[in-house]
Curated annotation (Swiss-Prot):
Record-level GO BP terms: adaptive immune response; immune response; innate immune response
Pfam families the record matches: V-set
Protein name: T cell receptor delta variable 3
Species in which this protein is naturally found: Homo sapiens
The UniProt record lists the keyword Transcription: no
Protein function: V region of the variable domain of T cell receptor (TR) delta chain that participates in the antigen recognition. Gamma-delta TRs recognize a variety of self and foreign non-peptide antigens frequently expressed at the epithelial boundaries between the host and external environment, including endogenous lipids presented by MH-like protein CD1D and phosphoantigens presented by butyrophilin-like molecule BTN3A1. Upon antigen recognition induces rapid, innate-like immune responses involved in pathogen clearance and tissue repair.
Record keyword DNA repair present: no
Coiled-coil spans in chain: none
Amino acid sequence: MILTVGFSFLFFYRGTLCDKVTQSSPDQTVASGSEVVLLCTYDTVYSNPDLFWYRIRPDYSFQFVFYGDNSRSEGADFTQGRFSVKHILTQKAFHLVISPVRTEDSATYYCAF
């Protein structure tokens, strides 16, 4: 099974401020039943940003996956039991974890805020 991870850089200019999201490992091949961690780091001057994971499935449908901030995270109904996030505040990281991976998880995943 191939999980395609979207590679995105999002820049928001507010005067001289610049916010950025960086995803690494743009394409990953993952065996069904294993675990995958989709990496996302962000850079912002805001102390409690709203962070999101979205995905675009092979049929081009767009889906919300996960939301998080400094105190909580919440996933879409389909994420229950298999999807989670690792929000590491000190590293400004918001990684998506899928375990166990299923074929229906194949999609392009995007991290944003």
